């Protein structure tokens, strides 16, 4: 029986997942269009606080948090209050879960 090393298949499987994740990420133009379409831009900007926090500040606060994507996606969908002050963020039930996840993933890539 011929034995083959297992590491190449593990490496290429991992590379496939990374490539798919990179493919799913929004580019800046698509993300900004989604911000406008979904109404996020009424309260948020990339680099300055409007009513809600700047997206760069959100990315900095949650940097390194492995649960940030899931937790923030949930807050965007259901709304929240108290994390960035007492002005509530309304729920965004009209935005699809996939769009929310893509937008939050993009936000988490931003740097100051």
Walk through the language-model features, giving the residues of each:
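N-terminal export/targeting leaders of redox proteins
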Residues: 1-29, 111-112
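Short, low-complexity, Pro/Ser/Thr/Gly-rich segments in the mature regions of secreted, periplasmic
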Residues: 105-111
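Sequence/structural segment immediately N-terminal to covalent heme-attachment motifs in c-type
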Residues: 26-46
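Short microdomains enriched in Cys/His and/or Lys/Arg
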Residues: 61-71
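Axial heme c-ligation environment in periplasmic c-type cytochrome domains
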Residues: 42, 48-62, 75-104
């Amino acid at each position: 029986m011929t034995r083959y090393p297992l590491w190449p298949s593990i490496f290429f499987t991992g590379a496939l997942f990374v490539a798919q994740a990179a493919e799913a990420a929004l580019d800046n133009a698509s993300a900004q269009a989604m911000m406008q379409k979904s109404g996020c831009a009424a309260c948020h900007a990339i680099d300055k606080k409007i009513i809600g926090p700047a997206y760069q500040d959100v990315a900095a606060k949650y940097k390194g948090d492995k649960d940030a994507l899931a937790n923030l996606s949930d807050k965007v969908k259901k709304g929240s209050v108290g994390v960035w002050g007492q002005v509530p963020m309304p729920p965004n039930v009209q935005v699809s879960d996939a769009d929310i996840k893509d937008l939050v993933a993009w936000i988490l890539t931003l740097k100051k």
